[in-house]
Amino acid sequence: MREKTVIAADLGASGGKMAKGSYNGSRLLAGDFFDFENKPIELNKNLYWDLFALYNSILQGTVRYSQDCEADSISVDTWGATYGLLDSKGRLLEPIYHYRDLRTEHSMERMYQNVSREKVFQLTGCQPARSYTLPQLYSYVEHQERILDLADTMLFLPDLLTYFLSGEKVTERSIAGTSGLLRLDQEDWCYELFRMLGIQTDMLLPLTEPGTERGMMSRRIADSLNIKQMKVISAIGHDTASAVAGIPYFGVGQVYISIGTNINMGVEVTESVTGETAFRGGYKNAAVMEDRKILYRDFAAFWLLNEFQRSCREEGCSYSYQDMMELASAAKARSVFVDTDDEILNNAGGNIKEKINAFLERSGQETLTEDADFIRCILESIALKVKYCTEYLEKELHIPLHKISVINGGTRNYVLMQMISDALARPVYCGLPYATLTGNILTQLYALGELGSVDEMRDLSGRSFSMKEYHPVEKRKEYWDSGLQKMMEKGVCK
């Protein structure tokens, strides 16, 4: 067979990545990774994504990969919930808001005055955070803005970039599932919720399946880049769902933990899981591909480390990720933890060390002074949250688990990987630092007819890539068990 070559772009909240994937019929090669910056823009007290810088970076990567071969296709996945509004002529109506923009600071509480949190979960299977599309759209209603009346089309970020590349407007189902706006079965929009909140629906498109060709890259773009046209594919637009689709031999009874700016962790299911226990545990449902869904929780992870780096730079001290791992390894375990879901810790700006100490003081814990202790506190808090969520799946939702797979860029943090293994008191399999790109590439091969199912995608991933196994240190089990018990009593882990 002729070797297939595809280009994958993955936009994360902290940065973008691209790769070229080559498939010869038996093994997949993914390489020539190209990283680029995703730097938000603050303007007049609002926070925006630099959409056109991201788009230009994708074009640069496309040129790079087209120098020595003709690519068959390209696809883009992104973080969830971010959207763009277009007018009837296909023009953007406003800049693309960052999900941490403060215009939604009070939108959740006001939204729940109209429709209860429980009702939203019953209708959608989702428990939106402030960063989700639902509260962002409700903020227009809350502030009596007319922007939705002017909008002809709403496109989520991967669909918006697909539109830029091909001229085709579509809404792919997995990325729409990050919005908090779909029905419980994840098959269509929850029009009842739109009506209850007074959000108009004229800008919505029908949902389409991932792994579908969307036409060719526009000739104008190809000519301007001096490259051959290629197919544009809607892969699995939601970055986490894309990563899950590419985990080697993943399936029932396994937990995935995708670590980057945020953690998204959960299990794969065929039917949405609802009920009081799932609701109380903060779990949500979202679509992946075929009839597969994920039951998951998400919370901040390296966002806190990024904020720590920023705060230290403002104080005149610069730490690399390697520096932080070494400091954390050398620091004493103090058994102090923060809730990575805490709203104040997740607001942009301010000094994260001051925010952490304020949280520790409020929760009756020892405050910190040394940078190494702050770093260790952040990492241990992430590991403790993972432990809490994993035990909730097993003990409260009664989902038997026999394997833990940790994926994406966070797996490079060997200190955190060992902490997670120790906290869970079981082996964890870590790897695929570019798992989302891998899933993107595999889904393109599916769309091109080279693979026939998600199972075949995962089998190919298993034949092509290896995972590193971390084993727990038995003597540390008591530290994590007592830490979780203490934090649950204080209401820190929830």
Predicted regions and their residues:
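A conserved helix-loop-beta module that forms one wall/lid of the active-site cleft
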Residues: 197-210, 441
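Short glycine-rich phosphate-binding loop at a beta-alpha junction
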Residues: 70-79, 153, 206, 398-408
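Carbohydrate-associated surface elements
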Residues: 101
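N-terminal glycine/serine-rich phosphate-binding loop of ATP-dependent small-molecule kinases
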Residues: 1-94, 122, 222-232, 424-426, ...
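Short acidic-aromatic active-site loops that bind/stabilize oxyanions
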Residues: 47-55, 126, 130, 207, ...
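Short beta-strand-loop/turn "lid" adjacent to the catalytic site in phosphate-handling enzymes
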Residues: 63-98, 127-131, 162-183, 206-209, ...
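Glycine-rich beta-strand-to-loop/alpha-helix junction loops that act as flexible
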Residues: 77-82, 210-211, 259-261, 403-412
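Active-site core segments that coordinate phosphate-bearing ligands/cofactors
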Residues: 7-8, 112-124, 138-156, 162-168, ...
